[in-house]
Swiss-Prot record:
Domain (CP-type G) ranges: 116-275
Disulfide bonds: none
Record protein name field: Small ribosomal subunit biogenesis GTPase RsgA
Binding site for Zn(2+): 299, 304, 306, 312
Protein task: One of several proteins that assist in the late maturation steps of the functional core of the 30S ribosomal subunit. Helps release RbfA from mature subunits. May play a role in the assembly of ribosomal proteins into the subunit. Circularly permuted GTPase that catalyzes slow GTP hydrolysis, GTPase activity is stimulated by the 30S ribosomal subunit.
Amino acid sequence: MAKRQLTRRQSWRIEKIQEERAARAAKRESRAVEELEGGDLGPEQNGLVIAHFGVQVEVEAEDGELAGQVCRCHLRANLPALVTGDRVVWRAGNQGGGVIVAQLPRRSELCRPDMRGQLKPVAANVDRIVIVFAPLPEPHANLIDRYLVAAEHAGIRPLLLLNKADLVNEENAAGLDALLATYQRLGYPLLEVSARQGAGMQELQAALDGHVSVFVGQSGVGKSSLVNSLLPGVDTRVGALSEQTGKGMHTTTTARLFHFPGGGELIDSPGIREFSLGHVRRADVEAGFIEFRDLLGHCRFRDCRHDREPGCALLKALDEGRIQPQRMASYRHILASLPEPEY
């Protein structure tokens, strides 16, 4: 059944209701912070945001007597928006709970536009983005390339992960092999695993240990199942594929951080079906295709759009086989999806 399209007035009304609810929640939160700060608060200490719940976050104490304990904290009104992975300074309350008083500088952040097109961080201090795909739902190179551009733009190392490798069969093997070969030729690290059967999971654990990683990928590729396999005993509601569409049904409802025994962390974020890159410029997309980098600036015309222009270094490389046709098609598709001024 097709999804019903909202009119502009309906969309405005929904947005207005959400704003009113957010304002009421912020007012209640402000009163809660005032009550906490009116009592006795403990000393300032460092903490790690491991989950975000609207106007409150869960903080894991990193030092002091409470080290390792998790506390639900309120945020001071003057703080910027916090996300899972943020490191903060907080103070514990005498009735439980606590107050976050400062955000520590981020080493990196992974961002995407929200429904209004405004840039919104989704995870902080990540140093590895694991791009998960599977034989089902059918993987699309364009979506993988969008994630790679986002990773390159954020300065976060990507790892390509084919999950549900046990579902590879005669019908999809050739297409998957061609897809994987494209990225292997570019030098991207790639692993094949089966969370259900356990194949390749030790290699994946070794690749994640010592890093702060985030799993991304369309719904239904098994991100929550991977977490359950990597961290037995952790409950991340596992969903199934829709029998009608073959697409994934969303499961995880909030980004959450988990610790690995080897010292690394994993941020499990909500499944997303379409990753928008509306916040990047044309130059960012070009730089996100790593095989373009040595060619950029060598076209005959400074404002070359790499379409039909004579003397284009990228088109020459495409003709010579140094750029794969699939990647050039993805590049053009991504550019076409950008806001008009950036295209």
